[in-house]
Amino acid sequence: MRFIGLVLLLLSVKLFGIDATLEIVKNTNKIPYIVVERLDSENADFGAKVLKMLAADLKVSGHFQVYDGSVNKNSEVAYKDYADKKIDLLAQIKVSKSSNSLTGTISLYDINTSKRIYVKDYTENDVKRFPFIAHRMCIDVNSYIQAPSIEWMQRLVVLSQYTTSGNSEILIADYTLTYQKVVVKGGLNIFPKWVDSKQESIYYTKYLDVPTILKHNLTTGHIEQLVGSEGIAVVSDVSKNGENLILSLSPTALSDLYLYNTKSKNLRRLTNYSGIDVDGKFVNNEKEIIFVSDRLGYPNIFMMRLDGGGTEQVVLHGRNNSAVTSNGKYAVYTSRETNNEFGANTFNLYLISLAPGSNYIRRLTASGKNQMPKYSNDGGTIMYLKYYKAQSALGIIRIDYNTNYFFPLIKMKIQAFDW
């Protein structure tokens, strides 16, 4: 069994003609120290926001030790002063505003070589999208040191939130939820799912005559009806090429899983159980699915092959495992740890290997109610909802670095999300 543990960053980077900063990282088994400064400019408000977001992104990456250098009025870089403080990299930013557009400029300096590495501009045509300027800056700084990719930072999160009784709206947001934009409203709109990696269209369920799965192009506004079902109609997963969907439908009784081909419109039933089968996810090169079922009398995690055959119980731990996500080779599930009839219960997240014969299991959370785990598109990060002591937050787990980060949910009641 392959162990997922803490990664020794950058030690396996293969370079020819490696520069001084990367040489230090390689030889001393440490991650680089970076100072982030804002150059004095007229747009202090947005400059401060981008600076704060960039520093946070660098920390979340797990690839830097970050110092916030605040405002610098001196355009000359005092390399020796930074070197004396054991600083490896310096990032200086400034932000300019034109009408409703923002442009952020970053100058990255390698203190060990006393050289400016690059100057890059990043423009967003909506000032509310300033977080993405910071996210893109961070991705490029991360690429410079050739650390593992953090491209997931610039992906959009799509989420549904309850507004009033019987109503919910769908929003798109950055991973910190700092940027938010409503894209669907009016009625009950739930279970949003990205159509593909381009993030131009979404699937979601809308209550019409019956719950109905819709495909909504966010650019053109075009809406297409796919499938309706009396009790439940949800897109649980999308194949990598976007052609096949796993649907949770209940046309006659309780929920079963179906495979839907978006080109042929063919709908094939995968499970035929008298109870509840939901939350199916593609695994093992999309030859199998993992899903939640109550066929043992309580919710648990099972697997089955798409070409037929019986179901296999995957999780032997716990008696209430109610949600699952997978990157194909590993899965993360939600498990109820307590059974308080009248009080709050604890739900934790667990990571398991899907390799045949593996018994690897690792707890990812320790307290509170941790639910709705979702893997990032690169399979290295988990997003989830955390409720603890009357507070709620969107959580990020960097699996290889054993770190958690939280973004408070203020006046938000999230129904479901995808990223």
UniProtKB/Swiss-Prot annotation:
Any coiled-coil regions, as ranges: none
InterPro entries: 6-blade_b-propeller_TolB-like, Tol-Pal_TolB, TolB_N
Any one biological process term the GO annotation gives: cell division
Pfam families in UniProt: TolB_N
Main location: periplasm
Localization: Periplasm
Keyword Cell cycle appears in the UniProt entry: yes
Signal peptide coordinates: 1-17
KW Amino-acid biosynthesis (keyword) present: no
Source species, domain of life: Bacteria
Family, per entry: Belongs to the TolB family.
Main function: Part of the Tol-Pal system, which plays a role in outer membrane invagination during cell division and is important for maintaining outer membrane integrity.
HAMAP family for the chain: TolB
NCBIfam families found in the cross-reference section: PRK04043.1
Subunit note: The Tol-Pal system is composed of five core proteins: the inner membrane proteins TolA, TolQ and TolR, the periplasmic protein TolB and the outer membrane protein Pal. They form a network linking the inner and outer membranes and the peptidoglycan layer.
Name this polypeptide is given: Tol-Pal system protein TolB
Source species: Helicobacter hepaticus (strain ATCC 51449 / 3B1)
Lineage: Bacteria, Pseudomonadati, Campylobacterota, Epsilonproteobacteria, Campylobacterales
